[in-house]
């Protein structure tokens, strides 16, 4: 894994920087268990994966949420800087993002890094940037996903093969703790112990062998299938009058609800046998998330229902 990352991103990782985990969820819990003291804070950007709050509370921490920037769903950096204080221990970012599919730009990561460097000096603390990257390989149209350790020395990466290999049930991933991270040797040692004490013990050894094979033979999901699905559903929904940002990655579409209460819209959609998740589940009310990680034919069959819903709300004639 270290060699593969070095080839792809020009890094200089070694085996000691990699800790195999039981998926990305386990990896995040391992790092938070390692970092957090009771009452310390972790900041994340809305919209965000709802389980982050539970992960932080597992270790008596507090999740602080930055309001969404609904213009382009890049992070709201003005509010972000305001929310950092002496209790801030870590920042969680997720790019490509669930639920928007947006990829944080290189400029965004550079600005986040500059803010964190400034705040570390201001408070005399160490703030870890924890990048949750289960969708890293799912980027479309030649868009690159910037690798966060290039921009900030105190960055830790969590990865899962659930999406890149379509094996979510196998629970296999890793965390990268670079040598450049503050007290990296202590952090790596503590994370190794945390992997055991939270009950994961170690990542499944048989699946680790499968991962080695997949890396050596460049096995991954068929991106063309996802991109084809994205183009179909995005094109149809925008044609019907819905508003949504075209995702550069992942396999979600984050759609603006035609009514203020998006849960009401979810119930209407359900009557047409369309299931969508309310944006309030991601701390971004007024939107809904749908997933296009299904067959192309299933999306085609759903389009008449989406059109009827649009007609009900007067979005199209």
Which residue stretches match the model-derived regions?
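Class I S-adenosyl-L-methionine
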Residues: 2
């Amino acid at each position: 894994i270290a060699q593969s990352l070095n080839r792809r991103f020009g890094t200089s990782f070694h085996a000691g920087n990699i800790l195999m985990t039981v998926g990305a969820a386990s990896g995040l819990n391992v790092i938070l268990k390692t970092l957090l003291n009771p009452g310390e804070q972790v900041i994340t950007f809305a919209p965000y994966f709802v389980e982050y709050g539970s992960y932080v509370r597992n270790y008596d921490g507090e999740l602080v949420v930055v309001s969404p920037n609904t213009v382009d769903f890049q992070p709201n950096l003005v509010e972000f800087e305001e929310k950092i204080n002496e209790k801030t221990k870590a920042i969680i970012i997720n790019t490509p993002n669930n639920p928007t599919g947006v990829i944080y730009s290189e400029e965004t990561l550079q600005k986040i890094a500059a803010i964190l460097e400034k705040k570390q000096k201001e408070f005399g603390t160490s703030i870890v940037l924890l990048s949750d990257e289960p969708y890293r390989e799912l980027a479309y149209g030649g868009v690159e996903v910037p690798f966060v350790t290039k921009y900030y020395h105190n960055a830790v990466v969590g990865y899962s093969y659930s999406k890149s290999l379509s094996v979510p049930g196998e629970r296999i991933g890793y965390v990268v703790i670079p040598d450049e991270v503050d007290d990296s040797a202590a952090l790596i040692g503590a994370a190794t112990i945390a992997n055991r004490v939270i009950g994961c013990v170690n990542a499944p050894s048989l699946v680790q062998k499968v991962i080695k094979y997949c890396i050596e033979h460049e096995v991954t999901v068929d991106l063309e299938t996802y991109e084809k699905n994205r183009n179909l559903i995005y094109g149809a929904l925008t044609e019907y009058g819905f508003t949504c940002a075209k995702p550069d990655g992942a396999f979600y579409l984050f759609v603006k609800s035609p009514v203020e209460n998006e849960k009401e819209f979810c119930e209407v959609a359900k009557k047409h046998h369309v299931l969508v998740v309310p944006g309030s589940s991601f701390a971004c009310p007024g939107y809904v998330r749908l997933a296009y990680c299904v067959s192309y034919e299933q999306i085609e069959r759903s389009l008449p229902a989406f059109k009827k819903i649009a007609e009900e709300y007067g979005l199209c004639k």
